[in-house]
From Swiss-Prot:
Its EC number is 3.2.2.27. The active site is at D59. One of its GO terms (biological process) is base-excision repair, AP site formation via deaminated base removal. The lineage of its organism: Bacteria, Pseudomonadati, Pseudomonadota, Gammaproteobacteria, Alteromonadales. It catalyses: Hydrolyzes single-stranded DNA or mismatched double-stranded DNA and polynucleotides, releasing free uracil. It is an enzyme of class 3 (hydrolase). This is Uracil-DNA glycosylase. Pfam families: UDG (PF03167). NCBIfam families: PRK05254.1-1, PRK05254.1-2, PRK05254.1-4, PRK05254.1-5, ung. SMART domains: UDG (SM00986), UreE_C (SM00987). GO terms for molecular function: uracil DNA N-glycosylase activity. One of its GO terms (cellular component) is cytoplasm. The gene is ung.
């Protein structure tokens, strides 16, 4: 079932209509990231029936040219944000012979079935969490619940306390939930690097007859 069907009812709800109007109004008055056409990139690039992994972020990067609708990802040519750099360090720990990419665009992950979902989908330039209370989490909670209900054998990578608050939305009997500290430099040393989440994800997928993710 496509997103258009799964989320049609949600997008008609008053809260979502008001949320979208508020974002549109903000675009008239300030710079909002990501660009309008990229807000739903995570959903555009990863159909529900293809989802193997969900990586939850918080809200988009708030610097120029960084956010393009995929959690943790930046377009090619943009400097690696620290959390993303630490994610690739963790991949290198899990797969020591890996040659890491020179860019931080995770579109190839999305195309393989990794839903790179921020819980808040827009932000004002230079003002982290500025749209956090606008209603986005009601929408993305629904996305998480729909993924849990409509799929089987998906790995949910929940890094940091914000992402881990979403555990009640996920059916742990038919999915794999992996938790670790956030890859931010503030917390990564507390257990992110030795969580081995990238290898564990692929081990789980293969155990359930699914193609592993090519992380690089």
């Amino acid at each position: 079932m496509p997103w258009s069907t799964l989320l049609a009812e949600e997008k008609q709800k008053p809260y979502f209509q008001q949320l979208w109007q508020r974002v549109e109004q903000a675009r008239q008055e300030t710079v909002v990231y990501p660009p309008k056409e990229d807000v739903f990139n995570a959903l555009k690039l990863t159909d529900p029936e293809n989802i193997k992994v969900v990586i939850l972020g918080q809200d988009p990067y708030h610097g120029p040219g960084q956010a393009h609708g995929l959690s943790f990802s930046v377009p090619e040519g943009v400097k690696f944000p620290p959390s993303l750099r630490n994610m690739f360090k963790a991949i290198a720990i899990d797969y020591p012979d890996t040659v890491l990419p020179q860019h931080g665009d995770l579109t190839s992950w999305a195309e393989q079935g990794v839903l790179l979902l921020n819980t808040v989908l827009t932000v004002e330039q230079g003002n982290a969490h500025s749209h956090a209370s606008w209603g986005w989490e009601t929408f993305t909670d629904t996305v998480i619940s729909k993924v849990s209900d409509a799929t089987d054998h998906v790995v949910f990578l929940l890094w940091g306390s914000h992402a881990q608050k979403k555990i009640p939305l996920i059916d742990g009997n038919k999915h794999c939930i992996l938790t670790a500290p956030h890859p931010s430099p503030l917390s990564a040393h507390r257990g992110f690097f030795d969580a081995n989440h990238f290898r564990k994800t692929n081990d789980y997928l293969q155990q359930h007859g699914r193609q592993p993710i090519r992380w690089v």
